């Protein structure tokens, strides 16, 4: 791993709890500073922040969540979220696609894995909760890929559609680039068929 990658990963770890507290604060405060913990993007996908253990029942019973796509690294979910076994016990399958916080970009392969996972649950009429720490960047990139696949939208159209529902998403230029690659692959595949 390059020195810059080590620094980025270290910075993400140092800032994890302060930025998580900020996310919790924004979820609890009332008024214009309030941010909902999660949003329903369509009939299948919910985009949100860490699914804390106390949210499990609501996600499963009220939102019909049967799949969870975790874009976090292991240390981010260790104490506050369900383990894969705990999700399974609740009737939920977890797919972890670890991506470094703040600077990380989901890989093209992981975007494809995540989209296929969501499509599996879409076919079953069930829902998938896609999350990272705050539900703003890593997970929003994954949801954009899903929308690109489902609607044959451009990356910009997918991001705009998400932002209309969850206005505080933040897709960085490097994440937009991987979405453009994803779109190019999806478009090329569709042209062959």
From Swiss-Prot:
PROSITE patterns: TYR_PHOSPHATASE_1, TYR_PHOSPHATASE_2, TYR_PHOSPHATASE_DUAL. SMART domains: DSPc (SM00195). Predominantly expressed in testis. Expressed at lower level in heart, brain, spleen, lung, liver, skeletal muscle, kidney, bone marrow, eye, lymph node, smooth muscle, prostate, thymus, stomach and uterus. It catalyses: a 1,2-diacyl-sn-glycero-3-phospho-(1'-sn-glycero-3'-phosphate) + H2O = a 1,2-diacyl-sn-glycero-3-phospho-(1'-sn-glycerol) + phosphate; O-phospho-L-tyrosyl-[protein] + H2O = L-tyrosyl-[protein] + phosphate; O-phospho-L-seryl-[protein] + H2O = L-seryl-[protein] + phosphate; O-phospho-L-threonyl-[protein] + H2O = L-threonyl-[protein] + phosphate. Pathway: Phospholipid metabolism; phosphatidylglycerol biosynthesis; phosphatidylglycerol from CDP-diacylglycerol: step 2/2. Coiled coil: none annotated. Its EC number is 3.1.3.27, 3.1.3.16, 3.1.3.48. One of its GO terms (cellular component) is mitochondrial inner membrane. Disulfide bonds: none annotated. Changing residue 76 to A: Fails to dephosphorylate PGP in vitro. Disruption phenotype: Mice die prior to E8.5. The active site is at 132 (phosphocysteine intermediate). Residues 1-31 form a transit peptide. One of its GO terms (molecular function) is phosphatidylglycerophosphatase activity. It is an enzyme of class 3 (hydrolase). It is a peripheral membrane protein. Interacts with STYXL1; the interaction inhibits PTPMT1 catalytic activity. Lipid phosphatase which dephosphorylates phosphatidylglycerophosphate (PGP) to phosphatidylglycerol (PG). PGP is an essential intermediate in the biosynthetic pathway of cardiolipin, a mitochondrial-specific phospholipid regulating the membrane integrity and activities of the organelle. Has also been shown to display phosphatase activity toward phosphoprotein substrates, specifically mediates dephosphorylation of mitochondrial proteins, thereby playing an essential role in ATP production. Belongs to the protein-tyrosine phosphatase family. Non-receptor class dual specificity subfamily. This is Phosphatidylglycerophosphatase and protein-tyrosine phosphatase 1. It comes from Mus musculus. The gene is Ptpmt1.
């Amino acid at each position: 791993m390059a020195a810059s990658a080590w620094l980025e990963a270290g910075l993400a770890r140092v800032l994890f709890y302060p930025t998580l507290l900020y996310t919790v604060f924004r979820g609890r405060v009332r008024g214009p500073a309030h941010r909902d913990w999660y949003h329903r993007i369509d009939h299948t996908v919910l985009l949100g922040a860490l699914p804390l253990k106390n949210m499990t029942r609501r996600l499963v019973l009220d939102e019909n969540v049967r799949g969870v796509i975790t874009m976090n690294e292991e240390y981010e979910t260790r104490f506050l979220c369900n383990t894969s076994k705990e999700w399974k016990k609740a009737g939920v399958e977890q797919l972890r696609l670890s991506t470094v916080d703040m600077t990380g970009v989901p890989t093209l392969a992981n975007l494809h894995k995540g989209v296929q996972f969501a499509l599996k649950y879409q076919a079953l009429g069930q829902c998938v909760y896609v999350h990272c720490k705050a539900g703003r960047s890593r997970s929003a990139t994954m949801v954009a890929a899903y929308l690109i696949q489902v609607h044959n939208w451009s990356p910009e159209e997918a991001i705009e559609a998400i932002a209309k529902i969850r206005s505080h998403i933040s897709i960085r230029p490097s994440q937009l680039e991987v979405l453009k690659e994803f779109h190019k692959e999806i478009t090329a595949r569709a042209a062959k068929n």
